[in-house]
Amino acid sequence: MVVGIHRPSKLVINAEAIRNNVKNEISRLDGHSELFAVVKANGYGHGIVETAQFTKQAGATGFCVAILDEALALRDAGLTETILVLGITDVKYAKLAAENDISLTVGDQAWLDEATQILNQKPLKVHLGIDTGMGRIGFQDGASFKKAADYLEQSQQFNFEGVFTHFATADEKDTTYFNLQVERFNHFISQLTRRPRYVHVSNTATSLWHAACNGNMIRFGVGIYGMNPSGKTLESPFDLQPAMSLESELSFSKLVQKGRSISYGATYTAEEDEWIGTIPIGYADGYERRLQGFHVLIDGQFCEIVGRICMDQMMVRLPKSYPVGTKVILAGKSGEKSITMTDIAEYAGTINYEITCGFTQRLPRIYTENGVVN
């Protein structure tokens, strides 16, 4: 992995914003609920270890990740809190997870049967996943779920730590399907002879707009990073503070004559003499080609991206001549104007956290406290 520290393009991560988002959500929970920080996918692009540390400082009592490798990275960083792997882990790594005190998601009896042949001394912590309508992983019928739960209660090789589901439409106005999933989940839970330590259903969207369903632990994900999971559909009950900015500088500036074209395919042609600036960032950094025609901020003014975005560079139309080294905001604030990840996502036809997850490791992550670099 090569990190581009010798060019001006970088991601700036506001640690205080991350902590404030977590603290604000914790303040809304009842006294019996915990917040686990979802730091999968490199902390949604913000840095997995750094984000975990910031959220722990703000009161998170555990972490959720997607794959075992992410959990092991947190352990290697010295984090000792509960870590739940939300995806299905190959059963051959059950012993490795147990040895590192990592909790795994289980979605069928066959996995438990095979793990029993592998585990020896240290019990494995497991959460049973229930498919109430996401259609992804988990038990689909009550009978198989109850069989697995009873099996865990009787086994010395497992610690039945939790049970959970995931909602497909918690970030939408229409709650019909959401309510159906709640009903199905409650039916599953009613079959337990004993509830495990954690009964959890809430992702960020559920915790923001359906707090009554929280259970005793919430999986707070995109909200950590100050992004609304519904985009602009639903209003957040508190101010989510964006944690990530994307900044660069002009690497080149030139006056282009009327009739000259810009970038691959010659898809943009100057209709008059124009100042064109080049920015050293491109789709290899996660700033996608489909953002042609969108804008950046320079000197508090929106400047259109002209021509196709290249792998490592892109061009913008300037209102006047600006010198090389002029600051460029691709996401964040400049003067009275701002560009949010949601703005970028809407133009690209996607969701805000796909944008942040897509920024590659070539972009340095710079962490700040109250505007000062750590």
UniProtKB/Swiss-Prot annotation:
> What cofactor does this one take?
pyridoxal 5'-phosphate
Task: Write down the Pfam families for this protein, in alphabetical order.
Answer: Ala_racemase_C, Ala_racemase_N
Q: Which residues form a coiled coil?
A: none
Positions of disulphide bridges: none
Recorded catalytic reaction(s): these are: L-alanine = D-alanine
Active-site residues per Swiss-Prot or TrEMBL entry: 40 (proton acceptor), 264 (proton acceptor)
- Uppermost EC category: isomerase
Q: What is its EC number?
A: 5.1.1.1
NCBIfam families, per the entry: alr (TIGR00492)
Protein's recorded name:
Alanine racemase
* Source organism: Pediococcus pentosaceus (strain ATCC 25745 / CCUG 21536 / LMG 10740 / 183-1w)
